[in-house]
Amino acid sequence: MIEKKKRATPWKSGKVISIRLRNGVYVLAQMVREPYLVFFNHFKEENSWKGVTLKEENILFCKAVTRQFLRYSPVTIVKDLEPLLDYRLPKEWIYSHMGGHPITVSVKGRERQVAGFGQRLSLVQADKDSGLPEDNPLMGLFQAYILPDIQEKDWERVGQAELMSIEVFPTLNERLYLCFLHGKNVNPELDISLGKPLPDDYETYIDILTNAQRQDASI
């Protein structure tokens, strides 16, 4: 049985939801500790999940999301799936230092500038389930540096870590659609932040990013 969402979905740890992406693709996610969602590598073109079992090895990524994401995304509560139990949030995250400048990106031979990216990235320890104080001298967000200044030689090491940003609609939705296309975790925000070459299918993600920034600038 699937219950259709009529208003912004209230948060409850363990609640399993599906999210409709573009082109009629659905993805499964689970609410854990607010505001974190765990997204699974379970995609379908029909919003029916019979026979699916949520397992840790099928997790794409875990990310903090805004209420705006839940309000504007087409979300459905899935009641006939058992949630993943005893999930613990990741202990390694990527911290983006403030004071960044616009980054020039190129997709399909077209160059554009995107803003809002830090000038330096660090891999940090942030054990959010430990109860330890998160008392670094900069922002109070993590406990220790693992790699203070991520370089190209570190890309493979940090590839599965998530930025400590909070995701919004519709950029997160497009990221999830890219995960569907590639059949694995894809992270355009991190690829842009690291200065990696961007594949052609990031074009829509960059369109969304630059359009949102133009709208913000006009307010």
Which residue ranges define each predicted feature?
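Short N-terminal edge-element motif at the start of the domain
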Residues: 1-62
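Short, isolated positions within intrinsically disordered regulatory regions of eukaryotic proteins
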Residues: 15, 53, 97-99, 159
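Amphipathic alpha-helical interaction segments
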Residues: 48, 57, 69, 101-103, ...
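Long, low-complexity intrinsically disordered regions
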Residues: 62-128
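A eukaryote-biased signal for long
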Residues: 107-219
